[in-house]
UniProtKB/Swiss-Prot annotation:
It holds the Pfam family KshA_C. Its main location: membrane. Its cofactor is [2Fe-2S] cluster. Catalyzes the production of 7-dehydrocholesterol (7-DHC or cholesta-5,7-dien-3beta-ol) by inserting a double bond (desaturating) at the C7-C8 single bond of cholesterol. This reaction is the first step in the synthesis of the steroid hormone Delta(7)-dafachronic acid. This is Cholesterol 7-desaturase nvd. It catalyses: cholesterol + NADPH + O2 + H(+) = 7-dehydrocholesterol + NADP(+) + 2 H2O; cholesterol + NADH + O2 + H(+) = 7-dehydrocholesterol + NAD(+) + 2 H2O. Pathway: Steroid hormone biosynthesis; dafachronic acid biosynthesis. GO terms for cellular component: cytoplasm; membrane. One of its GO terms (biological process) is cholesterol metabolic process. [2Fe-2S] cluster binds at residues 158, 160, 178, 181. It is a multi-pass membrane protein. GO terms for molecular function: 2 iron, 2 sulfur cluster binding; cholesterol 7-desaturase (NAD(P)H) activity; metal ion binding; oxidoreductase activity. PANTHER family: CHOLESTEROL 7-DESATURASE NVD, IRON-SULFUR DOMAIN CONTAINING PROTEIN.
């Protein structure tokens, strides 16, 4: 990913320089008679456009610009109010979103923060010697990287007088230094190692640290309500580590729903044939997705959801066969098989393989920001020998389908005891599987007339 960034930076510098160089070379070659002049015939034969090297400059410049545009990773970051709401007359998007959130019935909710690993941020956003602020599970964290490349995660607020270590804090060795009084805390165990104006550092001077890991181009943080150390690991996608698959972009959305509702979609097989059958040209507004204008393109889905046995009982799989119908006709060459492997409550690897479009993975991560606000990211990695346009199209198509779900989630009520038919059996099975990520002390919220009661 870093090499892609360097390539784009280099190209952005070289494009204007290359254009000037091509212009100069073209002028020299034309002056020497080594290139043919371009003649523009008009009614007046004496009018000619000659000795102009525009073609020599324009064509390579357009090629360079096109290559740069196609190679650049697609970054589509949506704000919380941007997707999933029907605008109300006389109100802005933000006002509409806030109104819907206030008046929506919440239902009888499960615990709000399941135990597990969660994505904090992407690795390329944390260069050596820097610190980033991160909101995770209702808390503020400081994520920093030492000059040697090691990543640590600590509470953002200094236990001395509460300064935010991620706002002006400095990385010193393997410690982070508070911008307020210069206290330094070691990332490994949180121990304060230096107070500039104190003769001795007291033993009680510590900051809370969080278990973390870095792989697949991301930094993950472990959460357990009882402070238990990690009981399972985030799997490594070897093709990403070996750079056989390269990064082509990500999307990021905010969803106003309980975290469990998002992965539950994998077991809600019936919704695929109803919500996601219309082609992507039908858009994301559910009022219009079934318009007959785009009815000639339809998606077909065959899905199976299964939990994995021990020792991987924290994992489950959705096996999906996708096909496209054009004017009611099936084209087998467009079929795609997807294996979506859920690891814990907040990480999914959507591995897809196509006969001639190649192979790749979308890493789907759900991170609770606060009780009913989830940050959902989709990062795509694809075979490096496949044109970048292919994975970017796949990511955009995934984004459109996902935003249809967002419109449902942002406006729905959670029902703890849903009215199910036998064809919905996988939903109840998924809820039993997901319950393993809650424990007796998992935080809960209840909603009363007077407000929010924690």
């Amino acid at each position: 990913m870093e090499s892609v960034g360097h390539s784009l930076l280099t190209l952005s510098v070289l494009c204007p320089v290359g254009a000037l160089l091509l212009c100069w070379v073209g002028s020299v070659l034309l002056g020497a008679g080594l290139l043919p002049s371009l003649t523009l015939s008009t009614r007046d034969p004496s009018t000619t456009l000659s000795r102009t090297p525009w073609l020599v400059v324009l064509v390579p410049l357009l090629v360079l610009w096109g290559w740069r545009w196609l190679s650049r990773p697609m970054e589509l970051l949506r704000s919380p109010e941007e997707v999933g709401y029907i605008p109300e007359r006389g109100r802005s998007r933000a006002q509409t979103a806030n109104l819907v959130r206030r008046r929506r019935m919440k239902g009888e909710l499960p615990p709000i923060y399941p135990n597990g690993w969660y994505r904090a941020l992407d690795s390329h956003l944390l260069p050596p010697g820097t610190v980033q602020d991160c909101t995770l599970l209702g808390e503020q964290l400081a994520v920093y990287r030492t000059l040697e490349g090691k990543v640590y995660v600590v509470d953002a607020y200094c236990p001395h007088l509460g300064a935010n270590l991620a706002v002006g804090g400095k990385v010193v060795g393997d410690c982070i230094e508070c911008p307020f009084h210069g206290w330094q805390f070691r990332g490994e165990d949180g121990k304060c190692t230096r107070i500039p104006y104190a003769e001795k550092v007291p033993d009680f001077a510590k900051i809370k640290t969080r278990p973390s890991c870095e792989l697949n181009g991301m930094v993950f943080v472990w959460y357990h309500c009882d402070g238990i150390e990690p009981t399972w690991s985030v799997p490594e996608q070897e093709e990403i580590t070996k750079k056989e698959w390269v990064y082509h972009g990500r999307t990021e959305h905010y969803v106003n729903a309980h975290i469990e509702e998002i992965p539950e979609n994998a077991a809600d097989i019936a919704h695929l044939d109803f919500l996601h059958t219309p082609g992507i040209l039908s858009g994301v507004d559910l009022r219009y997705t079934k318009s007959r204008i785009w009815d000639f393109v339809k998606h077909s889905w065959k899905v199976q959801w299964i939990p994995e046995p021990a020792p991987n009982k924290h994992c489950s799989q959705m096996l999906l066969a996708h096909s496209i119908l054009l004017f009611g006709k099936h084209f087998p060459l467009l079929d795609v098989n997807v294996v979506a492997r859920q690891v814990g409550p907040g990480i999914v690897f959507l591995h897809f393989k196509h006969a001639f479009l190649g192979e790749g993975v979308i890493v789907h991560c759900v991170t609770p920001v606060e009780p009913l606000l989830q940050k959902v990211s989709h990062s795509i990695y694809y075979q490096k020998n496949i044109p970048a346009l292919i994975p970017k199209f796949i990511l955009k198509a995934e984004c459109i389908q996902f935003e249809r779900d967002v419109m449902i989630w942002n406006n729905k009520k959670y029902i703890s005891k849903p009215m199910l038919v036998k064809e919905d059996a996988a939903i109840q099975k998924h809820r039993r599987w997901f319950s393993q990520f809650y424990s007796n002390n998992s935080p809960q919220i209840t909603f009363q007339q007077e407000g929010l009661d924690w």
